[in-house]
Amino acid sequence: MIDLLDLAAELVDIPSESHEETALADLFERRLRDGSNLAIDRVGDSVIARSELNNEHRIVIAGHLDTVPANGNQQAHIDGDRLYGLGACDMKGGLAAQLATALAVDEPAVDVTFVFYPCEEVAAQYNGLSHLFESHPQLVDGDVALLGEPTSAAIEAGCQGT
C-alpha cells in the first residue's frame, strides 16, 4: 500500500516549475511503466497511462505537473497529517492520489486514462493538456474527465483555456 502523504512529499521535493517538468514527468513515466498494467505514452513532458480493456465507457483523470515559481518554499515538510511545500495543494497532493490510483487499478469497470501534463500555471498557449487535444486527441478521448485541482471539496465545471 502506498503512503499518500509520503508520496506527495516526494513529489513536492522534485522541482517542477512551469516549463521545467521533465524530472517529475520522468518519475511518473518510470513508476507507471514499472508498476502498472496500463499502456504508457510520453508526449514531451506529458505522460499518459491508459487501460485498454475495450470497456463501453472511459473516464479521464488528469492533473498538471507544474508549480508556480519557487520562493524559498520548495522542500516538503510534514507536520502531523499535513504536508507543506511548493505545490503541495496545487497540485502535488492530487497527483499523488492519481498516481497511486493508476498503480492500484488492475481491471476497472470502465476504461481509464490518466493524463499528467505540463504548463497549467502559465498562459493557456503553453498548456500541455490543450496541446494533447490538438496533437494526440485519441490519447485524451473519454466520456467524462476529472481534474484533481484544489476546490475546497466543491465540484466545479471548467478548466483554464477550455
Language-model segments: residues:
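Acidic/His- and Gly-rich active-site-bordering loop/insert found
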Residues: 1-88
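Conserved active-site and cofactor/substrate-binding residues in soluble primary-metabolism enzymes
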Residues: 19, 23, 27, 93, ...
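Short, mixed-charge, low-aromatic patches
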Residues: 57-60, 87-89, 142-151
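Active-site metal-coordination/substrate-binding segment of hydrolases
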Residues: 58-116, 124, 128
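Acidic/histidine-rich catalytic neighborhood of metal-dependent amide-processing enzymes
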Residues: 96-161
